[in-house]
Amino acid sequence: MKRIAILATNGFEESELKSPKDALEQEGFQADIVSPQAGKIKSWSDGNWSNSYNVDQTIDQVSAKDYDALVLPGGVMNPDTLRTNDNALIFVRDFFKMKKPVAAICHGPQILISADVVKGRTLTSYKSIKDDLINAGAKWKDEAVIVDEGFVTSRNPGDLPKFNSKLIEEIKEGKHAEQHA
């Protein structure tokens, strides 16, 4: 069974975690919520705090070796917190080093900037972080979903059906020879 890590903390955009998690589980994959803290993490939806989700593993209990792919949901607070967590950045970098699929949506690519893995990559994101990605060396496009050698990105919750579909496709393909950290 394929195991997928969904890296998140308090303030993640609820639909950007729930929708991919549900799609992955419907495919028969195990989708673990990985977070810096144990217990529960609280989502953000429609401008307010929303539902809490159980953390399956803490970041210090796992490594990229334990998983087949990584998903990075957005939200404004979630990536802003994760991008300052050294263990989270190492975890993200290791997926790239191992050439495993990585998917990020909305503000999720901010974590990838801090992990220093976007230079030379083609991707999309929420429009407000476009300049940050370009300044970090990425090639940014305003499209619903971009796939760059196992690296899947989307702009916002409206793109989730296409994002989920491409994510599953990349997981089924596995490692990518051209994926680089």
Residue ranges of model-derived segments:
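Short, thiol/selenol-centered motifs that function as redox-active sites or metal-ligating centers
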Residues: 105-107
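Extended, subdomain-level signal for the structured scaffold at the beginning of enzyme domains
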Residues: 1-98, 102, 111-122, 130-181
